[in-house]
Amino acid sequence: MKKRHVWAMCSVMAAFAAHGGEVLFEHGKEFKIGNRQCKEFRFVSPDPAKGRVVVDLRCRIDYPRAAGWCPCWQIEVNGKAITAAATRSETRLLNRPYYLNNKWHGRYPADNRSDKWYALYLPDFKSAERHFNPPSISEATRVALDISDLVKTDSTNTVTLRAGGVSGSFYKSQGVTDRTPGVVFGEIRIYTEKELSRIPRATEKIVRATVKNSVKTVFSVDRKSDAFNVSVSGEGTPVKSVFSVPGGGEIGLGGKDRIETPFYTVSRKVAVRSNRIDIYDTFVSKTNELIGVKIRYEIPQKGFDPVYVAGDSSPSAEEFPGGRNPSVFGVNAKGGYSMALLAQDDVFRVQNVQYCKEGFFGIRTDGLALKPGEPRTVEWSIYPVASDDYYDFVNAVRRDWDVNFPIIGSFNLSMNMFRKFSEKSAKGIVRNFGLSVNSFGCHIWSHLGGKYKEYKDVIFGMGMNSPQVRVKIDAKKSVLEDPRVVHQFKRECIANARKYTPDLKILSYIHNQISVGIDDDKYEDCRMINAKGKPMNYNGGATQKLFVPTKDNLYGRDFKKLADWYLDNFDLDGLYHDELNHCNSRIYYGDKMWDGSTVELDGNNNVKRKLSYVCLLKLDFTLDLFGHVMNKRGKLFIGNFSPETRSERKFRFPRFEETYSSRWIALSHLYTPIQLGDMLTYANTPKDMAADQRMALKRGALYYHYCGGTGCPTLSSKMFPFTPVELHGGWLVGKERILTAVSGEFGWRGESPEVDVFVFDELGREVKGYPWSRKDTANGRIFTLELKPDHCAAIVKR
């Protein structure tokens, strides 16, 4: 172990010597950070204009053997989480390429294209060497980052390391009991080099709230035979439409209304609205065989920076699949305008990939199926915006999609705690979170205590009302258990909640793809199939099978009955549905079902095989389940994952986004903008939980607590109900209240309400008597609030 330390120290010090650097900070020993914990380092920096500043460290997941990798740590410089890419053209990662070649598992990435970094499961740093080709101990566990653009010269700098997402259940299932989940960091050093940084200096943009009028954009469309241009303020932007051709090659539509290939025709209809251009491209196959087409709608990236990919402006965000936020938004700062592309119809949304790469940003599908003679219309829109504000685009889409409806809350997943809660504890969590709705989370056996405390499994799907269920005890052993003991546990929790907190709405957890029933074999034709043609289990486990429910298959019909069973057998106000869109994989690779819309194409653009998106396969089932629970049974629904289809919008209920990756928060922007509390790296301390709530506001979202508790009412206690009017990066305007993590002027256009102002400090505590002012204007009453650092506030109508 000492030799490894000496080797690592010498190798890094050799780098200092080679580059003539100065050591600003060093911590020579290994240290471990557990899940939801952090460690902070401070240093003083010279002027980075004279030489770049580098933070250099090693990391690995503390595990007794090599076992793959996961995104599980975060690094912040002066409070800003950083990624491998500094800009669209400059990397921050100095010591290695973005991907390394792992001999067993393929490409090992640096980060998750957001602010979570990968680490390897390893017993020590040296053991990584044999798993990479070529051997790369110095690279696979090492991260050297250029932070020159973020350091300050007039005050102390901080580097914060956070860990989280190392699965404790994985440790238990593999019989690892000699250590706790966490990330081990090796020698961390911060130093300068003579070489100058290529990263442009960051300029801190001070966000200040204003009472904004809706942006009115004057634009025009110029359609020539070879081009489709959209002009804002006289400056034209070309929007390209490119389609693949079976046999190889591609064809562009330009500004024409119709093109024809030997295999299909495309006819275009354009509708110019007041704030957007709606485009309808109808494809008709001319062949007697199934064919497919790749479709790209894109804008040259030159002159546009930043570019938001599915709402994420990070330079690491190159592409993102799916229909939750099927948009790209590019800012042309020089021209004073922005351009956005948006997928609209169900199929194009689900198949959609948003991207910014290779000189273009756009939206695409890689395999739209065309049956013989079948017309298929792809609907998409262009949004010209006369500002550089992404949220002006978001608010325009939200109005067009009619998704500004009342959102209930606050919501939590802590019903399983109510069996042991005292009356004081039950009322405390309701008061502190502002809870109006609470749900059971996964039905975890260990929650029951007693002999079940060491069980490593969960009851999913049909297992809940099955005579027996499969339960995994450890890595090798499973037993059969009677689920009625879980039923009794749920009833005891519900009884206490009804007694202590009678106004609290109670939901039960459901998941429509995972099941552990003893007789699940009868659903074998409904199994989820992976890319190798094999049936899938949840997270690759042994007992939890994955299925695809449809309105017509046996599993789908029985799952609808299961929803009724929950509502009939427990005193519930509704259901919480986890992972509404898909689980583990978006794509079903089997041949027993087909979504009728998706194919995989080979290198010559010929059909290789049929594929299916799970969301499309089960769409009719999903809509039927929503209607049954909400309309026929009159119950509440809350869901995980924003809608991927237009069809789902007719059912209005809260759907949040998890935060395994912080970029997922932006996926909520076009429906109910809700972040489920950080699931990986933020600790359960008052300071971190308050910071997490402020971060949600800065990313344009409301907040549902996930883990932990608060010792006092925080901002979330004043957050709901909330009917969105406008979203902004730092403050949200609702009909009932305004929530803010920034200073500025606030109000409701044309209204002069009386309000109460609640301010919360860096620990989430209310600050009584915090100063604010108001003034009446011709456009309504304006409230001015100057917040101290790390404070937030709710301005609530009386």
Language-model-detected regions and their locations in the chain:
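Active-site neighborhood of glycoside hydrolase catalytic domains
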Residues: 554-646
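Asparagine-centered strand-capping/turn motif at beta-strand->loop junctions
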Residues: 45, 283-288, 748-751
